[in-house]
C-alpha cells in the first residue's frame, strides 16, 4: 500500500471531495492525493453519526463558482431542483434560520457517487473504513 502522498483529505463527504478534486484540478493532476473515510465506498457521503449533515441545499453562486473556476459540474440528477430560499432549524428544532437567494436541493444519494467517479478519473485514491484518530507529520 502506498504511504507517501502530497495531500491527504479526511472525509469523502461533499466538502472533502471538493477539496480533493480542486487540488487535483489546480495542480493539473500532478499531486498524489488520498481521501480517507470512515464509511464503506457504497456509503460515501452518508450522514454523520448523530444524523445531521450539512449540504442538502446549496447556493447557486457556489455551484456557478465550482463550474466556472474549478471545473466541477453538478447537474440533474445530482441536483434535484432549484429553490429560491431555504429554512434550516436548530438541532432542537425550535429556532428557524432563513436563507434567501437562488439555490438547489441536492440528491444526497447520487451526488457522492458522481463525486467519486469524477475523482477517480483524475487519479485520486481512496481508503475506506478508516477511523482517523489523529494526524502526525
Give the residues covered by each predicted segment.
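N-terminal Rossmann-like FAD-binding beta1-loop-alpha1 element of flavoenzymes
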Residues: 2-35
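A generic secondary-structure micro-motif detector
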Residues: 9, 52, 104-105
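Conserved N-terminal helical subregion
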Residues: 82-137
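Predominantly flavin-linked oxidoreductase catalytic cores and closely associated redox partners
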Residues: 12, 22-29, 41-44, 118-137
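Flexible, glycine-rich phosphate/dinucleotide-binding loops
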Residues: 16, 42, 95
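N-terminal FAD cofactor-binding segment of flavoenzymes
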Residues: 22, 26, 38-86
Amino acid at each position: 500500500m502506498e504511504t507517501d502522498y502530497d495531500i491527504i483529505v479526511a472525509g469523502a463527504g461533499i466538502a472533502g471531495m471538493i477539496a480533493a478534486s480542486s487540488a487535483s484540478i489546480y495542480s493539473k493532476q500532478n499531486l498524489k492525493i488520498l481521501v480517507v473515510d470512515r464509511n464503506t465506498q457504497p456509503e460515501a457521503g452518508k450522514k454523520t453519526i448523530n444524523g445531521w449533515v450539512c449540504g442538502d441545499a446549496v447556493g447557486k453562486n457556489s455551484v456557478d463558482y465550482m463550474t466556472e473556476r474549478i471545473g466541477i459540474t453538478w447537474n440533474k440528477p445530482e441536483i434535484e431542483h432549484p429553490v429560491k430560499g431555504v429554512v434550516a432549524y436548530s438541532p432542537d428544532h425550535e429556532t428557524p434560520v432563513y436563507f434567501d437567494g437562488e439555490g438547489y436541493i441536492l440528491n444526497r444519494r447520487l451526488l457522492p457517487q458522481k463525486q467519486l467517479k469524477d475523482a477517480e478519473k483524475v487519479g485520486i485514491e481512496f481508503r475506506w473504513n478508516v477511523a482517523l484518530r489523529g494526524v502526525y507529520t
